[in-house]
Amino acid sequence: MTRSIAVGLGERAYEVRVGENLLDEAGRHLRPFLKRGRTAVVSDETVWRLHGARLEAALKTAGVEVHPVLVPPGEQSKSFAGLADVTDRLLGLELDRGDLVTAFGGGVVGDLAGFAAAIYKRGIDFIQIPTTLLAQVDSSVGGKTAIDTPRGKNLVGAFHQPRLVLADLSVLDTLPVREMRAGYAEVIKYGLLGDRGFFEWLEANGAKVLAREPEALTHAVARSVEMKAEIVAEDEREQGRRALLNLGHTFAHALEAETGYGEALLHGEAVGVGQALAFRFSAALDLCAGQDAERATRAIAAAGLPVRLSETPGHPFDADRLVAHMAQDKKAEAGRLTFILARGLGSAFTAKDVEAQAVRRFLVAEGARP
């Protein structure tokens, strides 16, 4: 059964469709958004090798002209060079505003293709077909598109909402276990930030989600998307509540910057340890009970994710370098550090004016070099 979740943004509203084997019906889903019957499918070489023929056949059956634009897999494609390459190839295809860009891949492809669509001829429509758990529950929904720079992650980008998101759970069958765990970090985030009941359901059913049991996986993805859609509809431009979706990300982005945004530390793995750190930092500041922080830590660890600096690739980390990366974070304002912290399980909030020295002391206590 396909679940349809609305992202209520007025004239830019769209649906996220969650279900099995949606790829085989992609032509029917995309056709209403095509004026000329042409789409450039931005994908990475691995995803295209695994699933490209299936998508291409479904689109061609519906009379859609398909132009694959393939990029190397991995975070390195989400760069100025990667963006220039994709936009140049879109120009070479002579796409116009009646055509469509289709992002077919994980978070890297979605961010890159979405940003290219946002700036191509001042904006062209695009559709997301996310192929990782992380992209299905998080990055494909909400219109954030960006590339990385040597100074930090996602620092250059735009808000550009897709016209449709197709989350086909069947493509997750080919997802490596490590990538599945990384995506689960974003699933558990929704419980930790605003739905204690969902967190407790994940404590009991997380193993089933990771094992890709259809009923559990469908519920986990659909509930995650529901929460993301509700928050985005309320606060599209991250002026308020949407910032809560960054739970764990201030720590995570600093760790990713230190490890070079590569395969050594996946984004979801960084978010996993980042959320555990955020809860323990909240407990250290007497904002939440220590038992809640430990419970959050245990639930993240149960998924096979790192929860301590000593377990994180790149260890040992330098506390001053991590704090310096945090000062570059988009959530930092006028030199003040902003964190998403917690008052308890399912109760996150935005904390501004966090003292850098308090963060540094906490990181040292967690095992970073002073």
Swiss-Prot record:
Transmembrane segments: none annotated. Binds 1 divalent metal cation per subunit. Can use either Co(2+) or Zn(2+). It is found in: Cytoplasm. Coiled coil: none annotated. Its cofactor is Co(2+); Zn(2+); NAD(+). GO terms for cellular component: cytoplasm. GO terms for biological process: amino acid biosynthetic process; aromatic amino acid family biosynthetic process; chorismate biosynthetic process. The keyword Ligase does not apply. Pathway: Metabolic intermediate biosynthesis; chorismate biosynthesis; chorismate from D-erythrose 4-phosphate and phosphoenolpyruvate: step 2/7. NAD(+) binds at G107, V108, V109, G110, D111, T131, T132, K144, K153. Its EC number is 4.2.3.4. InterPro entries: Dehydroquinate_synthase (IPR050071), DHQ_synth_AroB (IPR016037), DHQ_synth_fam (IPR030963), DHQS/DOIS_N (IPR030960), DHQS_C (IPR056179). Keywords: Amino-acid biosynthesis, Aromatic amino acid biosynthesis, Cobalt, Cytoplasm, Lyase, Metal-binding, NAD, Nucleotide-binding, Zinc. Zn(2+) binds at E186, H249, H267. It catalyses: 7-phospho-2-dehydro-3-deoxy-D-arabino-heptonate = 3-dehydroquinate + phosphate. GO terms for molecular function: 3-dehydroquinate synthase activity; metal ion binding; nucleotide binding. NCBIfam families: aroB. Belongs to the sugar phosphate cyclases superfamily. Dehydroquinate synthase family. HAMAP family: DHQ_synthase (MF_00110). This is 3-dehydroquinate synthase. It comes from Phenylobacterium zucineum (strain HLK1). The gene is aroB.
